[in-house]
Every structure is written in C-alpha cells, then in structure tokens.
Amino acid sequence: MRVAIVGGGISGLSCAYYLGKEGIDCTVFDPAPGGPMGSVTVEGCILETGPESWLAAKPWAEQLIREIGMGDRLAGSNDASRRTYILRHGRFVAMPEGLQMVVPTRIWPVVETNLFTWGTKIRMGLEIFRSPKTLPDRSVADFVIDHFGAEAVDYLAEPLLAGVYGGSPYDLSAPSVLPRFVEYEQRYGSVVVGTFRDKRKPTGESIFKSLSGGMGTLVEALLERVQLVRARVDSIARYEAGWGVLAEGEWQVFERIVMACGANRSAPLLASIEPQLSDLLAAIPYTGSSIWTFGYRREDVPHALNAFGFLVPKPERRTVMACTWLQTKWLGRVPEGKAVFRCFSTDPDVTRHAMQGDLRRLMDIKAEPIFALNHRWPDSMPQYTVGHSARVAEIEGLAAAVPGLHLVGNAFGGIGIPDCVRSAKTTAAAIVAG
C-alpha cells in the first residue's frame, strides 16, 4: 500500500512516522515541513518560531517523543515561578492562585485580588448554587457571562483564549473549547462544584512540557524517519484504483491519501472531488499570528521577571496580546545576563515598531534590544466557532464515505500538539487496519 500525506506539519509527520513503523510506504509532500514548529538559536538563546510547549496533562506528544528516543530531552516549565500577570488599569495584576482557566477553585485569592470588582467576586461565590442544565451550542462568552459575569470574559476568558486560539470568546464555541466545563454544567449546574468533585491529584510534574533543544528538534527527528518530497501539492485526483497527487509537475498514484495541510488548504484541493466536503472545510474560519521575540541585556530590564509572563485583555490592549518571559518559564534557554520576551499578536502584519514600542511601555524598558526576530503565520489558527462540533461531525461523515480519504490536523479534534499527534496516530491505525 502507498499512502500520500499532503502537509508536513506535526500532524502529517506524526502520521507518516506511525505508518512507517507498520511498514506502510508513505510519502509526505510539503515545501516547508514542520509548519510553524521550529527552533533557532540567537545570541545563545534557544527560540521558537511557533509553538513553544504543550500541556503535560495530554500524554500523546510525550508518548511519541519517548518512542523515538528523545525522552532525555523532555523539559518541564519552571513551575516554581508559575505566575501570570494580567494588565488591569495599566498595571500588572497577578492572576489569582487556584484558577483553572476561568474557574476559581480557591476563595481567598479571589477575595484579595484587584483583578475583579466586588460584583464579580460575589458572582463567583454564588455560582455554586446553580442547578444542572443542558443548553445548545453557545459561545464561550455567553457561557462565562452566564456563570461569572462579563468582567470574567474581559479579564480572563478573552486574554487566555486569544493566545491559544487567536479568536474571540464571542465567536468560539464553549463545547468545543471548554468541553470539561460544559460537562460540569450539565452534571452539576456549577462548574466550580464540578471542578472540585473532579479534582485531579497533583502529579508533581510541570504543567507545560517542551524539548531542551527546542521544538524544532522533534521536527528534525521525525524528518529522519519519513520519506519527504519538498514540494507543494498543486492538485489531487480521484481514480478508480486510488488517488493521484500532482507535485513539481509530476503525477504520482497512491492507494490512500491523508490531508494534513489544514482545512483551508484541503478545501480547494477537494473541491472537484467532493464539493460538499470542500464547502464544509472552507467554512472553518482561520486567523493568523505574529511572534516577535526581543532579546535585551538583563541589566536594561527593571522588572523582576518573576512570572511566566503577562496577558493583555482587550480593554487594555494596544498591540501586544501576550508575552512570555522566556528565561523565567524555561530554565536553560537563555544565558545569564540576558532577558528574552516572546510577544504575540493575531495581526500577522504587526510591525516591529508597534510591537517593540508597546513592550517598552509595558515593561518600562529604555534601551534598544540586542536582537529582534519575527515569525509570521497567516491563516494558521483554525477557529472553533459556535457550531464547530456539528460541522466536524458532518465533515467526518462525508470524508468516511470517500474511499481512501483521511483528514488529520488541528482543525478538527483539538488545536494543541498532543491532539494533533493523537489524531495522526488514530488515522494511521485506521489505515493499517484497512
């Protein structure tokens, strides 16, 4: 059996690895494999071009990494300094301890914080008296307002989700983005009560995981184990015996095809083969992002840098949406005497002048950086908007009816690296099973 994999991001490369492990002949097509995931070293600092980590609670990425012999390179976040600041009235306010996303699990930190007004604090306290209910798909904003009020959207849900999904809580689907909390609402009424009853025992491990040499080392390791054609797929065709793939002016024939290039790229390739499926894929909206990384002499930064970084809620925002303080979050990434700031925006065209100026204002930095690095990723972040789960179910049903066609990637069952690996492994197993 020959399998074509269109797209060489983490989903496509993982799928190719799992297929190859089972002796399946597969070819990955991508002119720039790895997608946003990559690493560079500047002035001795290990920097990421895209995602910097994954949630340790989701095991699939770590399982893959250990399987390919990279377990000794696993690195956990420096949770001794696990604190995040949120900008409120122009000042950094520490996010209250005990928050699980938007759900408070400790009373006193919420009482003491200056992040919320007393109206919101009282609302959070009374949330435990809610009755169970099941509602149709609704936005994250509607869900959070219903439970904790509008201020919790502005100063928790919006900044937290903007950095992960690049979208607005008024558009994102609560069941797709916050499935655990929606389940608590259905079972207990109160998401606070649900969180307490489902409290997971501390594992003692870091909340985030990465690789000591950078995420790009995972891409490099997978590329050593797969067959790659560094070319863009210009067209695909459905044959009676399988699939045709056109790349670099040459057609190749395969029995199976895995679309791992994103819903937005898969849609036009499938338009003439399965128009209804193509339309549904095209209906998944995408946003882009820009990551500006600035390096400074530590002596030029007056802040103590005693946290993972900060988030800027929309009411306070100019340009920077989120900023990671790299030397605090990841020990060993930044040499002594330097400070590195990884700044995020959903505007792929944001300029250095705008980003650096905003960082200087927020951090009170007067000096010029010793380096500045930009990575732009337009149309890279699928949006799980209201109705997403129903849309994905319909997409999966239509794809299953097309012999030899498979879809993987972050547009469907989870946006993080572990979710992509899980999707790839499941798809590979289905292909092997026939």
Task: List PLM regions with ranges.
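Dinucleotide-binding Rossmann-like beta1-alpha1 core, especially the glycine-rich loop
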Residues: 43-131
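Glycine-rich FAD pyrophosphate-binding loop
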Residues: 20-42
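Active-site/ligand-binding neighborhood in enzyme catalytic cores
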Residues: 83, 103, 107, 120-238, ...
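A short alpha-helix-loop-beta-strand transition element characteristic
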Residues: 39, 62-84, 151-155, 283-286, ...
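Mid-domain catalytic core of redox enzymes
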Residues: 22, 72, 232-352, 361-362, ...
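Conserved flavin/dinucleotide-binding core of flavoenzymes
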Residues: 37-39, 96-97, 103-104, 322-434
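N-terminal Rossmann-like FAD-binding beta1-loop-alpha1 element of flavoenzymes
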Residues: 2-28
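Hydrophobic anchor at the start of a short beta-strand
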Residues: 3, 24-26, 257, 369-372
